[in-house]
Design a protein with these regions (language model features):
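Soluble small-group transferase modules, centered on the S-adenosyl donor enzyme superfamily
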Residues: 1-39, 203-337
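Extracellular/periplasmic catalytic domains that process cell-envelope and extracellular macromolecules
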Residues: 22-23, 114-116, 123, 133, ...
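Acidic/histidine-rich, surface-exposed loop or edge segments in extracytoplasmic proteins
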Residues: 34-42, 174-178
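The AdoMet/dcAdoMet-binding core of the Class I SAM-like
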Residues: 47, 51-179, 183-193
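C-terminal substrate-binding/active-site "lid" region of AdoMet-derived donor-dependent transferases
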Residues: 165-229
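Cytoplasmic C-terminal tails of single-pass
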Residues: 338-346
């Protein structure tokens, strides 16, 4: 079947989203509710297609001896597959809430079978529920469960980060992916998460994935459990050099990113954003400036081409339908109210 962005390989309405697997040349893409979630080279399924996923390796910059890794959010399992291919001594757990996403990854994205003898274990569960039950501690936890249009609020609150802190080893690291900007109201969600995570972890670094920090993009946060001095850019470069001398694969993975030039060193003001808690986490308001902005994901046609127009058209149709539903509801509510008023007057 021909799809606006390529050939439709598979689709399903899951309990959590509408899932599409689309082929466009050598790139296979997982869409959730019309938004790109993961991409894969069909001829090299372990390689990372999207730049932001390469920043997952920052965890090994700060903790080069990491062995036990947890991914929160599976999708197409790009990060876990890449880690398995690059780090022979790493053990990976992945927690993904949607069983149909896991099935699609196995069937269409070369996800290895997990069993007692494999280095990857997959858990179909809500992340907080899983973390509350497990007694395991991790050297590195990667948070990749957010999208441009949806952020599960309970995965970015103070209580959640406190739970993560308990599940980290003494040198543990958190790498979190957030879509936003470093300037304007599109930075609100980034700054609120930064403010919240900083209450728990003593050192938090911010990396942009584009040179223009004002663009809407993937913003990567790196948070350390152990109290450390704040590394400067030069000190981080030396840290990377030390890892390189020790033949650690993370240096190779990060080489082509020029990632140190993306270290955000300006002061990040948080006095106008809330501390996110289980009792108060207005994430829908915070991400509203982000959801209303077109987001140019890599390796897909950009806005204005035939590629993403179906997504924007779908959003417009949804808005029209919601408006019509609201109008009909108001009409019948008023009609029912008038009928009740007449009955009361008789």
């Amino acid at each position: 079947m021909i799809h606006p962005t390529g050939a439709l390989v598979y689709e399903k309405e899951t309990l959590y989203s509408h899932l599409d697997v689309i082929d466009n040349g050598n790139i296979r893409t997982l869409y959730l509710d019309g938004n790109i979630h993961s991409q894969m080279y069909k001829d090299k399924p372990e390689e990372l297609v999207n730049t932001y996923t390469k920043y997952f390796h920052l965890g090994f910059l700060f903790n080069p001896n990491a062995k036990d890794v947890l991914f929160v959010g599976g999708g197409g399992f790009s990060g876990p597959k890449n880690f398995l291919s690059m780090y022979s001594d790493v053990r990976i757990d992945v927690v993904e809430i949607d069983p149909d996403v896991i099935s699609a990854a196995r069937d269409y994205f070369n996800l290895p079978v997990d069993n007692d003898g494999s280095r990857i274990m997959i858990y179909n569960d809500d992340a907080r529920n899983f973390l509350s039950k497990t007694e395991k501690k991790y050297d590195l936890i990667i948070l990749d469960a957010f999208s441009k249009n949806y952020v599960p609020f309970h995965l970015m609150t103070l209580e959640y980060f406190q739970l993560l802190d308990k599940k980290l080893t003494s040198d543990g690291v958190i790498i979190s992916n957030i879509i936003g900007s470093m300037t304007g109201d599109r930075s609100n969600i980034v700054r609120a998460v930064y403010e919240t995570i900083s209450q728990v972890f003593p050192s938090v670094y911010v990396f942009t994935t584009e040179h223009n920090s004002g663009n809407l993009q993937n913003i990567m946060l790196a948070a350390m459990k152990s109290p450390t001095v704040e590394y400067s850019k030069d000190e981080l470069r030396q840290l990377a050099s030390n890892n390189d001398n020790n033949n650690h694969n993370s240096s190779t993975a990060l080489d082509d990113l020029d990632y140190l030039e993306h270290l955000y060193e300006a002061e990040l003001k948080t006095n106008d954003v809330p501390l996110l808690t289980d009792q108060f986490a207005p994430v829908e308001i915070l991400i509203n400036p982000v959801t209303n902005e077109p987001y140019n994901f890599e390796n897909v046609p950009t806005k204005g081409s035939t590629g993403l127009s179906w997504i924007e058209d779908t959003n417009s149709i949804k808005l029209v339908l919601l408006t019509l539903i609201a109008a009909v509801w108001i009409f019948y509510t008023q009609k029912e109210w008038k009928r009740n008023q007449k009955k009361m007057s008789l």
